[in-house]
Design a protein with these regions (language model features):
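Anchoring transmembrane alpha helix of integral membrane proteins
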Residues: 1-70, 74, 84-87
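Transmembrane helix-loop-helix hairpins in multi-pass inner-membrane proteins
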Residues: 1-29, 33, 100-213, 295, ...
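A short, hydrophobic C-terminal helix/tail in secreted or cell-surface proteins
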Residues: 350-354
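Membrane-interfacial helix-loop connectors
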Residues: 68-72, 266-325
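Membrane-embedded helical hairpins/re-entrant loop segments and their flanking transmembrane helices
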Residues: 56-98, 265-282
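Short, membrane-interfacial amphipathic segments enriched in basic
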Residues: 212-228
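Membrane-interface helix starts
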Residues: 38-46, 235-248
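A short amphipathic helical element positioned immediately N-terminal to and/or at the very start
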Residues: 31-34, 226-238
Length: 354
């Protein structure tokens, strides 16, 4: 309970400091008027892209869970039930995605989402092994697609990125490097699990020797479970390469949707003169730079970087409104929706069944 309270206080504190810093000294009435004048059709389109971002993950969870169900005999197929309601549906899987988004948004480095998703999936009656493989597959592909996009941007648009990002270019490189390391660790666990265990044993031994850690056999158990789960995911994907291609394609569209959202805001505020490619490139660079930072929802740094890199793109009076709308839709709007879905799901779990 204390940990949850601390996380909430940290989240709200960072949010308050972020918006205080950004709005201090600004003409709030002009900002309000600019936001109010946002084109409704473009606002709806931007909100739709934000919802698609979360729903796409839910659709992938549903697609993979359904595919794994088909591998078993019809007699052993498990139905998920909350109360008397069947919930092994696309809608329920989308709910898992909203729950994951909420907990990822309020925990540092987005570490809280998957464990809670797994908890609800297991409570609904999904096999723990299937749920683990599905969530790990979605997470791995998510990171791989992000790294591929980041490396591609660096190779083909490196000069433009360095010019546009200026002082934030090193942060982009750091974000890309951290994501690349994360992908490398996961791929090592998937493809070379025994090597991963040996390397971890050596690292743990050094930390114990330096009195940084105390001996704890549970650490190795967790690493073996970690590598074993990813190994199971690899084995399943090898047997279903077509499923992997579908997930990669949907993940790519999912990634691009949140980048395209900013361009909808750009058009909705009546801006012109900057191509869709440049707006998407800049938004993608912001996302990659902050993705692995240990801040709840990457608050603060996301807004500060946005204000810097998009300053030449938006007119002076539209820059802050554009940030409030785009960030409001792709994070805070989805966070509130996720909180609502989480509250309803928690109520279902705690209500007595008859």
């Amino acid at each position: 309970m204390k940990k949850k309270i601390l996380q909430t206080v940290l989240f709200l504190g960072i949010m308050f400091l972020t918006f205080y810093t950004l709005l201090h000294g600004q003409n709030l009435s002009e900002i309000y008027q600019a936001v109010k004048n946002m084109s409704v059709p473009y606002l709806i389109a931007a909100a739709g892209l934000a919802l698609f971002f979360v729903c796409a993950e839910g659709s992938m969870i549903w697609y993979l869970l359904t595919s794994m169900r088909k591998k078993t005999d019809s007699q052993t197929t498990v139905l998920c039930v909350v109360g008397k309601e069947k919930v092994c549906s696309l809608w329920r899987c989308i709910q898992y995605s909203f729950i994951g988004f909420f907990y990822s948004g309020i925990t540092p480095s987005a570490t809280g989402g998957q464990p809670v998703q797994l908890y609800y999936m297991n409570k609904d009656g999904n096999k723990g092994s299937d749920s683990t493989i599905v969530l790990m597959t979605v997470a791995v592909i998510y990171k791989i697609v992000l790294v591929v996009l980041g490396v591609g941007m660096l190779l083909f648009c490196g000069g433009a990125l360095k010019t546009e990002l200026q002082s934030f270019f090193p942060l982009y490189l750091l974000g890309l490097a951290l994501n690349t390391v994360a992908v490398a660790v996961v791929l090592a666990a998937m493809l070379f699990p025994q090597w991963m265990i040996v390397v971890w044993a050596w690292v743990e031994k050094q930390f114990i020797r330096l009195d940084i850690w105390k001996a704890n056999p549970q650490r190795m158990d967790k690493v073996q479970t970690f590598t074993g789960n990813y190994r199971n995911a690899v084995d399943w994907l090898k047997q279903h390469p077509g499923k992997l291609i579908v997930v990669i394609a949907v993940t790519f569209l999912q990634r691009c949707s949140v980048f395209l959202l900013t361009y909808m805001v750009y058009l909705g505020l009546g801006q012109a003169g900057t191509s869709i490619q440049e707006v998407v490139l800049l938004q993608a660079s912001v996302y990659i730079a902050v993705d692995m930072l240990p801040l709840p929802g990457a608050q603060g740094i996301t807004e500060l970087m946005y204000r810097s890199v998009f300053a030449p793109v938006f007119s002076k009076g539209s820059l802050i409104p554009s940030m409030l709308i785009s960030r409001g839709l792709n994070f805070y709007f989805l966070l509130l929706a996720g909180a609502g879905v989480t509250a309803v799901s928690y109520t279902h779990l705690t209500l007595p069944t008859t």
